[in-house]
Regions:
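ATP-binding N-terminal substructure of ATP-dependent carboxylate-amine bond-forming enzymes
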Residues: 1-88, 102
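Active-site nucleotide/adenylate-binding loops and adjacent lid/helix of ATP-dependent enzymes
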Residues: 3-8, 15-20, 49-51, 55-56, ...
Length: 176
């Protein structure tokens, strides 16, 4: 099979591991940097170009899309799907993983245990915090990655102050 890894970092360990594993299984492997892919629809057909060369020989793609390129990465995966190229991860799954509340809902749907989690949408901040009975509260921004946007509030006043600031700034968050 001809397989492309969609990755900005060809030298990353995870990308190299996938390349080696695919090559070991006799697949033809390559890395396509999504930022060098252009998409078009020509004569009713989806077309992907990589550095101005049409990509039309792939059987499958392995998306490794960074958080900063989520929307474009999902669009690229959909475009390859329209070209009958299999993807190990759907565009919808890529989008779902970027939102912590959506992930929590999906985990709950399949009975995966997670800590008590409350969406920070209520205008009644005291009610939100009353669910934690003077315990430390972890406040997570919905779209943060790699630990960015995770705040530990050690007490009620700290949590209340942080939540008020986030709500004033229009930042979506959850509490655990």
């Amino acid at each position: 099979m001809n397989i492309a890894i969609l990755s900005k970092g060809e030298t990353l360990y995870s990308t190299q591991s996938l390349l080696k594993a695919g090559t070991k299984r006799k697949h033809v492997m390559e890395v396509l940097d999504p930022s060098h892919c252009s998409l078009s629809i020509e004569n009713g057909k989806s077309v992907v170009r990589f550095h101005d060369e049409i990509v039309d020989d792939l059987d499958a793609i392995i998306p490794r899309i960074g958080a900063s390129r989520t929307y474009y990465g999902a669009t690229l995966v959909r475009h390859f799907n329209a070209m009958n190229v299999f993807s190990v991860v759907s565009a919808e799954a890529i989008l779902q993983t970027r939102d912590k509340w959506t992930c929590s809902q999906l985990l709950s749907r399949f009975n995966v245990p997670i800590p008590k989690t409350i969406l920070g949408s209520s205008s009644n901040l005291e009610y939100l915090l009353s669910n934690f009975k003077n315990e430390s509260v972890i406040i997570k921004i919905l779209e943060g990655t790699h630990g960015n946007g995770v705040i530990l509030a050690d007490n009620y006043l700290s949590a209340l102050s942080t939540i008020e600031t986030l709500k004033t700034a229009g930042v979506k968050f959850l509490l655990q």
